[in-house]
Structures are given as structure tokens and as C-alpha cells.
Amino acid sequence: MKEAIKWTANHMPKSGDQQLPVMSLPNVAKARFFHSSFPQYSITPLAQLDGMAKYLGLGGLFVKNEAHRFGLNAFKVLGGSFAMARYIAQEMGRDVSEMTYDYLTSEAFRQEFGQATFFTATDG
């Protein structure tokens, strides 16, 4: 027997979220360009879940398994690495699109930026 999908409407008032500009299409393109500059980057394939799609009455259902992104057992690396690149670009008065893997691992970058230590955390 199929169980009905449960959902709840969001009745919270819309507000001016000051962080939304970071999700604009130009900024998303910069994030994609940044991550694709890494030699370890590869497109994560979609897994097709035919049985679940049929059970839910959908024509198709696809998911991405980001657990092995960049050879790591975590998917959160994308946000952390891009946040660091944005911070570095801001500190240097440059655009994040200039912060490629090759540049960030170069001696020229080390000479110009110096040293920094970054910490990231996860609840998982």
C-alpha cells in the first residue's frame, strides 16, 4: 500500500535575506569554475532510482552521491573550499574567479598572500 507523501507549507513571511546575492547565477558560475579548476574535480553522476520512482508514482527519480567528491568521504568540502577562496579574494581585493587551484597552490600566491590557517567543522 502506498503511503501518502506528507508536506507542510512554509507560512513564514518572506524577508530580505542579505545572503541571497551569493546564490545568484553569476556567483554560482564562479563557484562551479572554482571547483572545476581542481585536478581532482569530476562531475558526479546521477543514480537513477527506478524502484523508488515507481513507488512514489514518479516518472523518474535521480540522486547524486557526493560522498566521494574530491576523494573525500564528505560532500561538504565544496562549501568550505569556496568560502575560503571567497575570503582570500576579498582580503586580496580581487575577484574569486581569479582564485584557481593552480594559482592558490603557486609560489606566487604564497608570496603575495602569506600564511593563513582555516578551520572547518561539521555536525556529522
Residue ranges and their predicted role:
Residues 1-123:
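PLP-dependent amino-acid enzyme catalytic core
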